[in-house]
Amino acid sequence: MSFDLNLLKPVMADDGAVLNIVHPETEEVIEGMTITVLGQDSKIYRKLQLGKQQAALNRMSKGKKALDLDAEKLSEDSIDDLVKITIGWTGLSLDKKELEFTPENVRTVYTEWAWIKEQVQEFVGNRANFFRANG
């Protein structure tokens, strides 16, 4: 008997999956606070990764190291990538006003609230979050 591989496609990678944000102290879901992100198998995420690989190859062809590791630059790049794969949110407010979903606001949230960024990174890194439930 064979198994249909189509059943194992992370079909939500390009559609986006919803992360329920968890309180950093109580570890309980914050009701209504969600962030919708694309998965690591999405076309956009794969294009971002290919761009990084191409940049490393270009550096090597110029006789430079593939990566000059700089923690600050890596952190900025990580946030840049997350901004590009974040496609929506609900329930985020700042100073008692709803926080509009814009790339600038996404960048601010991921920069100022590292615990949110870490939850998003972990969620994106888990392919299981991007499969539709069967049946």
Segments from the language model and where they lie:
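C-terminal charged interaction modules
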Residues: 90-135
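Short, charged/polar N-terminal "headpieces" of proteins
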Residues: 1-61, 129-135
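Mid-chain, well-packed structural core segment of small domains
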Residues: 74-91
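Short, solvent-exposed coil/turn linker segments
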Residues: 1-7, 70, 93, 97
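Conserved catalytic/acceptor-binding region of the Class I
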Residues: 64
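Short, structured surface segments that line ligand/substrate-binding pockets
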Residues: 67, 71-75
